[in-house]
């Protein structure tokens, strides 16, 4: 077990100060310099303002040009429940609301970094510079690395809802589901934004019928709340706006990292695009389900969440790169679990290809497809420019990410992995006095160990 001194070394304090400075300077840049800083948060806030016509804002919630900024005409794309959740911001000054979003984003990044730190510690791996930074300093430095990666950088810029979605999903899986069944927080996340419902696949693989029922009931409750409190807007969303893909944006934009997005970036369209998407989507669900089962046998909850997050952005028709806020957790899972436990059983050539794809995905998505596409000074939207280097190359990291996870899933089919000894989760060795350390650490032990042993007993008696 790797241990660090309780006192934070000077370099760790410098890392903490650097993180605080980055957050403060980032906030000032967004409100004072960047004309589009907090753009998405402004849309959330205006959506909430329509409920009581705050500040004289009287537009319909699902009007096509809900917010107009220059040539941009942006709609409100979320369920009515999301507008209700953001209602408190309608009564706060815009700058105060942005400050809360920035602090919330930084807090979510810190928590994710804490989980990744605990993940590495439980795996017996030390993070770079951990010895000279100390525990808190290492988490601060890791938070900086997380917030500078493509998805989080763009999320910070737009003040997006994705860190909240991530926090709800992660919390539901790493908390002790003793009094409140698992699935409640995922259902709430689905009420804010539909795509998190795909995390129900983990519950399905676990045969957690209570969790699935709880998820479904919670999600339906969010819909009911929308119909009760917003009786005019709810039918507009559920019977009209939800089926209009043009409201989300241009599906061919280089920042679309979904399967459908990178297929278009590589030149497919029309029937070939549809057939390719449906085939790869079906393959993805099947292989990820197999991988989730093998991860379940080993109690690898964090890897399950990371893999399913990748499936979520792959299946959605449009997934902007900033939707992929679980990317840091997936990269950690690849390093700590995928390659040392699973990929090692692949043939040498396949293992090298998977490693190369993982590097391309990690580096490319850390930079972000938008930046890569912009470097070439070429058009990033029009269909006629599909084979322009900026679009094709910008789309390759998202393909590489998907392909890496598929390699991982195929590796989980190998006989040595399938026949490996089932062992309980090892997060219990993480220090219990860590900030929020029981989330993703000690609280998982008894529940997850019991689940693993139960599954092992079923297999032995089958």
Locations of the language-model features?
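Primarily membrane-embedded glycan-assembly and transfer machineries that use lipid-linked glycans
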Residues: 1-181, 206-324, 337-339, 385-389, ...
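Transmembrane helices and adjacent periplasmic/lumenal helix-loop junctions
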Residues: 186-203, 315-326
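Active/binding-pocket-proximal capping segment
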Residues: 328-333
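Aromatic-enriched
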Residues: 335-339, 343-445, 451, 455-462
